[in-house]
From Swiss-Prot:
<feature type="compositionally biased region" description="Basic residues">
    <location>
        <begin position="517"/>
        <end position="527"/>
    </location>
</feature>
<dbReference type="InterPro" id="IPR047854">
    <property type="entry name" value="RFC_lid"/>
</dbReference>
<protein>
    <recommendedName>
        <fullName>Replication factor C large subunit</fullName>
    </recommendedName>
</protein>
<dbReference type="Pfam" id="PF00004">
    <property type="entry name" value="AAA"/>
</dbReference>
<keyword id="KW-0067">ATP-binding</keyword>
<dbReference type="InterPro" id="IPR003959">
    <property type="entry name" value="ATPase_AAA_core"/>
</dbReference>
<comment type="subunit">
    <text>Heteromultimer composed of small subunits (RfcS) and large subunits (RfcL).</text>
</comment>
<keyword id="KW-0547">Nucleotide-binding</keyword>
<dbReference type="InterPro" id="IPR023935">
    <property type="entry name" value="Rep_factor-C_lsu"/>
</dbReference>
<feature type="compositionally biased region" description="Low complexity">
    <location>
        <begin position="488"/>
        <end position="510"/>
    </location>
</feature>
<dbReference type="InterPro" id="IPR003593">
    <property type="entry name" value="AAA+_ATPase"/>
</dbReference>
<dbReference type="InterPro" id="IPR027417">
    <property type="entry name" value="P-loop_NTPase"/>
</dbReference>
<comment type="function">
    <text>Part of the RFC clamp loader complex which loads the PCNA sliding clamp onto DNA.</text>
</comment>
<comment type="similarity">
    <text>Belongs to the activator 1 small subunits family. RfcL subfamily.</text>
</comment>
<feature type="region of interest" description="Disordered">
    <location>
        <begin position="444"/>
        <end position="534"/>
    </location>
</feature>
<feature type="compositionally biased region" description="Basic and acidic residues">
    <location>
        <begin position="444"/>
        <end position="463"/>
    </location>
</feature>
<dbReference type="Pfam" id="PF21960">
    <property type="entry name" value="RCF1-5-like_lid"/>
</dbReference>
């Protein structure tokens, strides 16, 4: 087992240094354990000072479960959401209490997935129903801008050299290691406040030599002394020791930003006019060398630039000032960021307005001055806001004052009345349309009935014509074998169909026929009688 794990603190009270920070964390954890939700914690400080250890000890002492994720390793939106986003909204299945979510190195979210990763972290913080502890190495990182307002920030300081030295002595005593006190103190000092690094270095020395001396320190490399940029500026302005300043200038940052930061804070620290003049002369020489480096692409000029802005500015003062001076960021960057915000806002507004006005955003940008006049009237401003669908921040581009709530209320009531009238008109129109449809249906039905009756009359007339025609044809064609009864029936049917002029003829004809038939019948009877008599 490595010594870092072997001699790691077993409870929160065992952690070295940062007593105030530990007390704040304990208060936060107590409130969560009592069921009072708190803002997520954001622990900020250099590596190796116990942030992660404290987070895990809090999880062990106060919560039922701990889930950890390194945000800099899992940078995309989907990965962060799936790994910790879902866990933040659900309670533990197997334990009753809250589960602690630990997100390490949130300031390390970078690369192409940056926007997605940062968005996932922000959404997790916003929607979480579980306690969250976030950790960052650089408290001044721009990547924490959106996270800081949502969290309770706690700053951690480096562990004091004496505290590290005492811990190393305890480890040596337990491991039965002989040591030179001066060598051990040098090791503690060179760890630069990083307790973890000091313990790891001690273990590396012991693996090579069972005794710690000044010579044994050569086994390990001096801890990379990359400074925080604000510590660098403090060293340049406060110190007169060239070696100390040179050590402080070992900072991983862009020279143009560093030169601006030093130049901004010179008049805040230096009080004598001649000191300020000399310091700015050094800044000017540094700037000349930076310009040469960028112009010729020969970056060896950078070392001269660092020499002038570091040792040169430090040497400009006759004595150090024992006062507190707050280091501020260059005003030029503040102004640029403000103007960038304004530019972005202007771009958003012109994009929205161009869609409605059917003109290019660039052309519209020239006309924004005239809209400022239109936005002076409250009611007109409200109408324009609604028409272009502008937010309150976007309205500020045209007017400093917010549109009064009374105007909004008045316009809303007016709009509601207009909507009601419009609805009534729509209902009326619907009724009119329905009546029109009914009338159309009625006229259509009437037309259909007319057409049908006309068709029926035509069919009836055609039928009667066909029957009369068939009767005429039957009369003209003679029948060969027709009985007298048939003839009589035919004659009767003929009598019915014939006109009144022929009715007298037919009646006389029938009477003659009747007489003939009666005579024949009499003859038959007489024959029959004669036969019987015979």
């Amino acid at each position: 087992m490595k010594w870092v794990e072997k001699y790691a603190p077993k409870k929160l009270g065992d952690v070295l240094g940062n007593a105030k920070a530990k007390a704040q964390i304990e208060v936060w954890a107590n409130k969560w354990s009592k069921g009072v939700p708190q803002k997520p914690l954001l622990l900020m400080g250099p590596p190796g000072i116990g942030k992660t250890t404290i987070a895990h000890l809090v999880g062990k002492e106060y919560f039922s479960e701990t889930i950890e994720v390194n945000a800099s390793d899992k940078r995309s939106y989907d990965i962060i959401k799936s790994s910790i986003g879902e866990a933040a909204q659900t309670r533990s299945l197997f334990h009753s209490g809250y589960k602690l979510l630990i997100m390490d190195e949130v300031d390390g979210i970078s690369g192409r997935d940056d926007s997605g990763g940062a968005r996932a972290v922000n959404e997790t913080i916003k929607n979480s129903k579980q306690p969250i502890i976030l950790m960052a190495n650089d408290a001044y990182s721009k990547r924490l801008t959106s996270i800081k307002p949502k969290c309770q920030g706690i700053k951690f300081t480096k562990v004091h050299t004496n505290s590290i030295n005492a811990q190393l002595k305890r480890i040596c005593a337990r491991e039965d290691i002989e040591y030179d006190s001066e060598a051990l103190y040098t090791l503690s000092k060179e760890s630069n406040g990083d307790l973890r690094s000091a313990i790891t270095s001690l273990e590396a020395i012991v693996d090579n030599d069972k005794k710690i001396t000044k010579d044994s320190l050569s086994v390990i490399a001096k801890k990379d002394g990359e400074q925080n940029i604000f510590d660098t500026v403090v060293a340049v302005l406060k110190s007169k020791n060239p070696e100390h300043v040179a050590e402080a200038m070992r900072v991983n940052t862009q020279p143009p930003f560093l030169i601006e930061l030093i130049a901004e804070n010179i008049p805040r620290e230096y009080e004598r006019t001649n000191e300020i003049v000399k310091a700015y002369e050094m800044i000017s020489l540094a700037d000349v060398n930076l310009g040469r480096a960028f112009r010729t692409q020969n970056y060896t000029y950078w070392k001269y630039a660092f020499l002038f802005m570091g040792r040169g500015v430090a040497a400009a003062k006759k004595q150090t000032y024992k006062k507190f001076s707050r280091i501020i960021t260059p005003t030029i960057y503040t102004k640029l960021s403000k103007s960038r915000k304004n530019r972005n806002l202007k771009e958003q507004v012109t994009q929205k307005m161009s869609l409605k006005l059917h003109t290019s955003p660039k052309e519209l940008e020239k006309q924004l001055v005239f809209y400022e006049e239109l936005f002076k009237d409250n009611e007109q401003a409200y109408d324009l806001k609604q028409y272009f669908k502008l937010t309150d921040d976007e309205v500020k581009l045209f007017r400093s004052r917010k549109i009064p709530a009374s105007v909004e209320k008045k316009r809303l009531t007016k709009l509601r009345k207009e909507q009601e009238l419009e609805e009534k008109e729509i209902q009326k129109q619907k009724i009119i349309d329905a009546k029109k449809v009914e009338l159309k249906e009625e006229s259509k039905n009437k037309k259909e009935i007319k057409v049908k009756t006309k068709k029926d009359t035509v069919e009836d007339s055609s039928k009667t014509k066909s029957t009369t025609k068939s009767k005429k044809t039957s009369k003209s064609t003679p029948t060969k074998k027709v009985t007298k009864t048939k003839k009589s029936s035919n004659s009767t049917t003929k009598n019915k169909t014939e006109s009144p002029k022929n009715s007298s003829k037919t009646s006389s004809k029938t009477s003659v026929d009747d007489k003939k038939t009666s005579k024949k019948n009499n003859k038959k009877k007489s024959r029959q009688t004669t036969l019987f008599d015979f």
